[in-house]
Amino acid sequence: MNNIIIKKRALTNRKLCSNSQYNWKKIFLTILCLFSILTLSAQETVICGQVTDANTGSPIVDAWVSVAANSNGIATNAQGYYKVSVHKLLKTSLTVRHIGYKTERKNIVLSDSVCVNIQLTPTENMLEGVTVTTRSEIRKLRESAMPISVIGQQQLQGTASNINDVLARTVGVTVRNTGGMGSASRISVRGLEGKRMGIYIDETPMSQLSNFVALNDIPTNMIERIEVYKGIVPYKFGGSALGGAVNVVTKEYPPVYLDFSYEIGSFNTHQISTVLKRTNHKSGLQFGMGGVVSFAKNNYKMALANLDGRVVERNHDSFKKIMGGISIKATKWWFDEMKWELILLRTKQEIQGIDLDIREAYNHSINYVTALTLKRKNFFLDGLDLDFDAGYVSGKYGLCDKAMHRYDWDGRVLPPVSPFGGEQNNFASDGDNRSNELIVKCNMGYTIDMHHALNLNIYADHNSLHPNDSLMDKSLGFRANFPSKMKTMTVGLSYDLTLFDGRFQNAFTLKEFLFSSHSRSIDIYSVKEPQPVKTSKNYIGFSNAMRYKFTNDLMLKASFNSEVRIPTSEELIGNGYSILASPALRPERTSGVNLGLLYRHIKADGGLIEIELNGFYNQLEDMIRFTPDMIPTMARYRNFGSVRTKGVELEAKGDICPLLYLYANGTYQDLRDVRKTIPGTEVENPTRNKRIPNVPYLLANFGAELHKENLFGGKGHNTRLL
């Protein structure tokens, strides 16, 4: 009996033990499920994408992106990208805000990761006919990987300065003017000047037109901003440049707009400019026209060193220029933007004498320009953007110097320089030179994702020159200039990398430069017939620029480039009357590095504080210089040799208060001749390791500006005291 009871108890204990194990398993599974649920609920969904302008498609910097399920938010980076994380929910809403744009809200169904691209529509505040749209383009440029200075509209608005005066206050930039309106000027960036500098208007190379249009011809009231690139030129600009580039961005006017301005200055200088724009909202067609008329007498008294300091009046240096154009732009066709432009440029500039009183000689030119622009986002493929430009320039220009009398400063009549006339050279001239140029630029950018992007740029230029000056040929007794052609092409492929939520940026570009020319050349030491000269060459270049942001305000920039500059048409094939062809001219090549530190802080009141330090080194090979020729009063371009540049620049500027803006900058640049021997000989170079003459090595600017809006009442007015 006892055994039976013991067995029963044993069975009962086993059953209890079994039930206990089952309960513990059940509890363990319950805890595991709860832990899994908690773990799953703790998992996050990543929401990323890009914020762009609904009208232009350009990225919007510093747009504020927030999620309904998360009280925190994030600002978009320099490419307009954002990335936020939220707890895994079935759905939520995304809110995007930016000053100057309508707030956008979007409902999202969540998964492991969601890509949401947002387009913001600008809000337009009409102030006496002026559309005010807030942009962050300047900040985007300043925080890019390339060394760059940006002159914004705030620095241009309300000033009577011209572009050259504004550029001269920029760190590392020197501007040399030979006189007043219409006179030649040379822009130098870090000691490299002239044709090494790329000149662009709205990212379009000036090319041949740079011989007839100067930056000073553009009124400052038509300019949105000026970008000064140092060393590296953006791949999307096309063409070739070594010292850097100046890109003038003109204003985008409101749908209905009329502007008229008149400026008067010293030396009887006058400039009239006007802009008219109308828009048909239904069809999306925009019609615009505008023009600039410039005139200057440029008369003043001067002391002549060759006449023992005698004071005479400079009275034959007047300048007249007319620029006018019309445009039609469509924004609702298959292309996001399709624009056609027609432009006329006409110039007449008198020539002033120094040794003698020149009274009749002058230069003249007339150019007709037609241009087509096509832009399309998501061009047959999501993320692929097309930007296409084509232009054709037809010009006629020359020197007119055929007076049959000359005069000294006492008014005495002298014979001309040749039996056929002429005042200034050793020959008479009545030039009717013709030039034609076709330019095509195609830029295609493909955004793979928020980290990777590719860009292909193709730039082609075909230039032909047909010199015609029978009077000069008669005076010389032979023909010195001949028809010539030049073709150039630049192909660039770039890769952009963005990491660590936009803190790190890197842009690598590989380029191939191709050019060919066909001309004829004479041997001044013999009586042989002109010999045909053909040239065809290609070169490889590359550049890399990177930027890392330690904080939102402090960043490090570094860049390296090995570039090639193809000679311009004027350097390679001449101009038909004073510059001879140089078909054997070699392209300039450069290798350089830049290291910089930028602190850029936006104050609570919207003011800006900037401090930037840069160090740079550059080695220029086959430098091209303008030198006299054996033919009297003629010149040609020749390769000079090697030049080394090194230096440092420091700039500080900021809004001390809403009324006061201070700036100061300084540059030390050391340019040395590093040729071992004189070109074409084995003779040791006597100027080796000596500074290049006429290039300043120490530059400094400082100043203050007082700003006051609506000082004299009204709205939208800005008064500045420099």
Feature names for model-found ranges:
Residues 610-611, 616-619, 638-722:
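Gram-negative outer-membrane beta-barrel transporters
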Residues 117-118, 218-257:
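A beta-strand signature from Gram-negative outer-membrane beta-barrel systems
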Residues 82-85, 204-230:
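Short acidic/polar hinge/loop motifs at secondary-structure boundaries
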Residues 50-56, 64-68, 97-101, 111-157, ...:
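Short, acidic, small-residue-rich periplasmic hinge/interaction motif at the N-terminus
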